C-alpha cells in the first residue's frame, strides 16, 4: 500500500470531488508532462516522467473518484491497472483494494483493446481492482467476460460527445466523479470543454522529452484560474480550474 507526503492532502483538498452534485459527474482532468509539454517520448511508448511522490499522489486522487477514464491509445501503450494503491484515510486493513479503486472506463470507439490478458484483468481476478466499462460506437461481435459495453452514437465528425459520455456514466452507472488521465487526444479535446472540467491537476516532471514526443497542445487558447502550486523532490504540481 502507498502513502503520500503529509503536505499533499491539504494542497489537493479544494480540487477534489465535493460529493454533493446533481447532474453530470465531477470531472478531474489530470496528467504528467515534461517541461516541454510532452506526455510520452513517442506515440505508443510508455514513458516515465514523474517522481514516485507524484505517482503516489495519482493513487491518492483515484481514491476519491468513482471512475477513471483513459483513451484506447493509452491503454494499448501502457497496459495500466487503473486501481488504487493508497492506504486510505483511516489506514483500514479491512478495506480492500477493490473497494478503494475507481471503475476503469476505456474510450475505445473502434474496439482495438482486449481486456483478456491485460493487467486490468489480472488485478480484477486478484480482487485488487474493478472490471472495466468500454465506451464504443458499435456492439462487439464477441463480448468479453466481465466487460460492460457502453454503446454511444458518434457525431458527424465520428466523435462521441463528451457531455453525452459523462451524462450516460452518471445516469446508467451512478458515477458522481470521474478522473480522466489521458492520452493526448483526450486531454486536448477536454481542455476546450471548460463547462465539463471541474479540476485540472498537472504534474510537471524535471525532464525534456524532445521534439518527437507526444505533445499536449489544445487547438486554441485556454486560460486557467484558481491556481495553486506544490513543489516536490523533482516535480511540481499545478492545480487549477478552466476559465469559462
Curated annotation (Swiss-Prot):
Functional summary from the UniProt entry: Catalyzes an early step in riboflavin biosynthesis, the NADPH-dependent reduction of the ribose side chain of 2,5-diamino-6-ribosylamino-4(3H)-pyrimidinone 5'-phosphate, yielding 2,5-diamino-6-ribitylamino-4(3H)-pyrimidinone 5'-phosphate.
UniProt record, GO biological process: riboflavin biosynthetic process
Family: Belongs to the HTP reductase family.
Pathway(s) per entry: Cofactor biosynthesis; riboflavin biosynthesis
Keywords carried by this UniProt record: NADP, Oxidoreductase, Riboflavin biosynthesis
Keyword set includes NADP: yes
PANTHER family recorded: 2,5-DIAMINO-6-RIBOSYLAMINO-4(3H)-PYRIMIDINONE 5'-PHOSPHATE REDUCTASE, DIHYDROFOLATE REDUCTASE FAMILY PROTEIN (AFU_ORTHOLOGUE AFUA_8G06820)
Annotated source species: Candida glabrata (strain ATCC 2001 / BCRC 20586 / JCM 3761 / NBRC 0622 / NRRL Y-65 / CBS 138) (Yeast)
Name of this protein: 2,5-diamino-6-ribosylamino-4(3H)-pyrimidinone 5'-phosphate reductase
Catalytic activity, EC: 1.1.1.302
Miscellaneous comment: Using chirally deuterated NADPH, the enzyme was shown to be A-type reductase catalyzing the transfer of deuterium from the 4(R) position of NADPH to the 1' (S) position of the substrate.
Superkingdom as given in the UniProt entry: Eukaryota
Name of encoding gene: RIB7
Amino acid at each position: 500500500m502507498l502513502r503520500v507526503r503529509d503536505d499533499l492532502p491539504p494542497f489537493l483538498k479544494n480540487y477534489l470531488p465535493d460529493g454533493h452534485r446533481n447532474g453530470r459527474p465531477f470531472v478531474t482532468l489530470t496528467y504528467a508532462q515534461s517541461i516541454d509539454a510532452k506526455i510520452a517520448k513517442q506515440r505508443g511508448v510508455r514513458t516515465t516522467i514523474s517522481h514516485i511522490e507524484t505517482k503516489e499522489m495519482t493513487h491518492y486522487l483515484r481514491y476519491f473518484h468513482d471512475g477513471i477514464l483513459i483513451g484506447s491509445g493509452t491503454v494499448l501503450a501502457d497496459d495500466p491497472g487503473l486501481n488504487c494503491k493508497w492506504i486510505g484515510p483511516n489506514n483500514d486493513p479491512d478495506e480492500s483494494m477493490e473497494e478503494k479503486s475507481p471503475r476503469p472506463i476505456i474510450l475505445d470507439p473502434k474496439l482495438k483493446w482486449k481486456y483478456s490478458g491485460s493487467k486490468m484483468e489480472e488485478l480484477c481476478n486478484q480482487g485488487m481492482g474493478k472490471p472495466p466499462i468500454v465506451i464504443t460506437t458499435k456492439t462487439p461481435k464477441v463480448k468479453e467476460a466481465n466487460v460492460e459495453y457502453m454503446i454511444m452514437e458518434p457525431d458527424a465528425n465520428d466523435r462521441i460527445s463528451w457531455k453525452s459520455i459523462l451524462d450516460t456514466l452518471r445516469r446508467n452507472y451512478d458515477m458522481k466523479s470521474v478522473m480522466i488521465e489521458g492520452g493526448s487526444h483526450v486531454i486536448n479535446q477536454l481542455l476546450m470543454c471548460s463547462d465539463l472540467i471541474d479540476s485540472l491537476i498537472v504534474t510537471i516532471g524535471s525532464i525534456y522529452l524532445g521534439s518527437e514526443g507526444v505533445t499536449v497542445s489544445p487547438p486554441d487558447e485556454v486560460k486557467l484560474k484558481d491556481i495553486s502550486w506544490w513543489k516536490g523532490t523533482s516535480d511540481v504540481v499545478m492545480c487549477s480550474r478552466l476559465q469559462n
